[in-house]
Amino acid sequence: MIPRYSRPEMSAVWTEENKFGAYLKVEIEAAAAWSQLGVIPAEDVEKLRTKATFDVQRIYEIEKETRHDIVAFTRAVSESLGDEKKWVHYGLTSTDVVDTANGYLIKQANNILRKDLQRFIEILKKRAYEFKDTPCIGRTHGVHADITALGLKWALWFEEMRRNIERFEMAAADVESGKISGAVGNFATTPPFVQD
């Protein structure tokens, strides 16, 4: 993100470090689901949780050779592991990791926006009460009309924003998700339980 157009908190969501961290979270949680199915030993999942690391520059070095971002990522992570590295990316395809991680990153960004929207709507509500008895000129067709209350204008903005937040939450529910369904997306090698 361009720093002058973003706050540090939001910029931090979209760093390469956080992106690859989200990839790793997806990889580990998928392995944990496989473990619940009895495929991956629980102790190997614990090793993935405690030992798996990556270095962004190392990922880029490997990507120069592989010309594939996820292959580079999984190899870089595997370098930090022992025998348990065989479970990295088990039953997954690249889009399983990328799409699910992107949903997670969007959720992080939306959580920042949620706080801002809540703070904003509280200000609108406060102003509506503060100015409930303050007269102002009403308008119709862009010209002066009858007297109205400035607080009413704030209340209308509040109500409009409340509806906007409802729409935001509906959209967020759609994008704060992912999918883990295997190589061609048909669950042929990866059961739906791993996704759920």
Model segments located where?
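A helix-coil-helix interface module used to build multimeric assemblies
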Residues: M1-D196
